[in-house]
């Protein structure tokens, strides 16, 4: 965290006049809000959690109470400011003694980082948009080609699909009584 948090001045009013200065209480609340937001988002990084373990913070009851206090960040009016939602997962896990004790193991930290990077590599915000074309049947069969078949042109795809079905039904499965 920064020693002296940088607080932006109030935005100008709609008539382009300068907004009144913040009261000392409002300024203090803003500093506290930014500091707690920055801290809770630091919890999203496993190496930071490892550092907290090394420095002994995770064994102090006052620090554990502070972590419980930070649970208010799950409320809708606060959660919208969180950029790294993984921090809330780790905030929950930090409430358990087993997780706190495992943070001393660098292999465990490496595994947390691997799982996290794997999650972010495959994570999507929403479902992919479905095209109208994907709802229709494809022009070319998606069935695997036999060794002696060549890829067909799209206009001949439906015709070849029928041939494949006939060929498969003729070949059938080789039973115990049939010769190879």
From Swiss-Prot:
Entry's Gene Ontology BP terms: regulation of transcription by RNA polymerase II
Keyword check for Cell cycle: no
Biased composition (Basic and acidic residues): 127-138
GO terms, molecular function: transcription coregulator activity
Main location per the UniProt record: nucleus
A Pfam family this chain is assigned to: Med31
This protein's GO CC annotations: core mediator complex; mediator complex
Keyword Transcription (UniProt): yes
Alphabetized InterPro entries for the sequence: Med31_sf (IPR038089), Mediator_Med31 (IPR008831)
Protein family according to the UniProt entry: Belongs to the Mediator complex subunit 31 family.
Subunit structure: Component of the Mediator complex.
Name used for this protein in its record: Mediator of RNA polymerase II transcription subunit 31
Source species: Cryptococcus neoformans var. neoformans serotype D (strain JEC21 / ATCC MYA-565) (Filobasidiella neoformans)
Gene name of this polypeptide: SOH1
């Amino acid at each position: 965290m920064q020693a002296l948090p940088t607080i932006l001045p109030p935005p100008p009013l709609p008539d382009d006049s300068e907004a009144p200065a913040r009261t000392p209480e409002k300024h203090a609340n803003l500093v506290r809000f930014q500091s707690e937001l920055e801290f809770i988002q630091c919890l999203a990084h496993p190496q930071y959690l490892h550092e907290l373990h090394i420095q002994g913070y995770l064994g102090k009851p006052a620090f554990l109470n502070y972590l419980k206090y930070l649970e208010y960040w799950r409320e809708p009016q606060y959660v919208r400011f969180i950029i790294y939602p993984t921090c809330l997962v780790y905030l929950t896990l930090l409430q358990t003694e087993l997780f706190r004790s495992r943070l001393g193991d660098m292999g465990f930290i490496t595994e947390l980082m691997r799982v996290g990077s794997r999650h972010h590599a495959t994570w999507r915000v929403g479902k992919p948009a479905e095209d109208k074309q994907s709802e229709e049947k494809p022009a070319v069969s998606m069935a695997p080609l036999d060794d002696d078949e060549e890829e067909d042109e799209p206009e001949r795809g439906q015709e070849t699909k029928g041939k494949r079905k006939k060929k498969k039904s003729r070949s059938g499965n080789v039973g115990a009584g049939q010769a190879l």
